[in-house]
């Protein structure tokens, strides 16, 4: 894989992973629309490692609290904010693991990796995000995250396995419907991404490690570093903008891209 292709894929993954515009959809589209080679599983895992590092660093205080609370959780005690956060993150991740295994075992996932599917999901879930953002309340903050809300958002997150949906987009949508303000909705959605990315990496990482060579390791390291920097920049920018801007710019982008993709798919 050329350095230019590697740079492009890592940059796109880093920028789109946490913005509500679907990273998987963009990574599937790049090879199809630009005629570049598919990144392969090794690079896919590497860029996810990079984005994982970025979100952990950005939310290190929350991550540290969840780690510190895990021993208490293992003894059945959910009596600290950290233990509660760790518990709710686990609960919210269960649906996506179950649905992911179902799609993998049945082979359905491969049939969903098409321009038409991505076009429809970009368009439909972009409009749903707009609806949720306009009608959603602001009475809840991230500290109000409850078991019921974790289950609800976890079920919505599972739908994001359909390419083009956007994991962050659909969990933010769910949070806005549940009454979380914009910053809190994004914060909870980003925290939910951590165990989800880890789970995805565990499934794919073992095979990659077993078959990796020196070239793959070099490309993976470059991709991880680039996606880390891009993701960290995207997170910083998004949360700064959310202080004064709604999710409408992301919706407009999704609708325009969705329409273009549908025209390409059905032309």
From Swiss-Prot:
Q: What biological process terms from GO does the record include?
A: cell wall organization; peptidoglycan biosynthetic process; regulation of cell shape; response to antibiotic
Identify the NCBIfam families for this entry.
PRK00281.2-4
Enumerate the subcellular locations listed in this protein's record, separating them with semicolons: Cell inner membrane
- Which EC number(s) does UniProt give? 3.6.1.27
Does the record carry Cell membrane as a key word? yes
Against Pfam families, the record matches this protein to: BacA (PF02673)
Q: How does it sit in the membrane?
A: Multi-pass membrane protein
Enzyme superclass (EC)? hydrolase
Named from the GO MF annotations, one term is:
undecaprenyl-diphosphatase activity
InterPro entries attached here? UppP
Q: What else is known?
A: Bacitracin is thought to be involved in the inhibition of peptidoglycan synthesis by sequestering undecaprenyl diphosphate, thereby reducing the pool of lipid carrier available.
The entry's function note states: Catalyzes the dephosphorylation of undecaprenyl diphosphate (UPP). Confers resistance to bacitracin.
What family classification does the UniProt entry report for this protein? Belongs to the UppP family.
For this entry, the protein name equals Undecaprenyl-diphosphatase
Question: Where does the source fall among the domains of life?
Answer: Bacteria
Q: Which organism is it from?
A: Jannaschia sp. (strain CCS1)
What keyword terms does UniProt attach to this protein?
Answer: Antibiotic resistance, Cell inner membrane, Cell membrane, Cell shape, Cell wall biogenesis/degradation, Hydrolase, Membrane, Peptidoglycan synthesis, Transmembrane, Transmembrane helix
Q: Which GO terms describe its cellular component?
A: plasma membrane
> Which reactions is this enzyme annotated as catalysing?
di-trans,octa-cis-undecaprenyl diphosphate + H2O = di-trans,octa-cis-undecaprenyl phosphate + phosphate + H(+)
Q: Where are the transmembrane segments?
A: 1-21, 40-60, 85-105, 112-132, 189-209, 219-239, 245-265
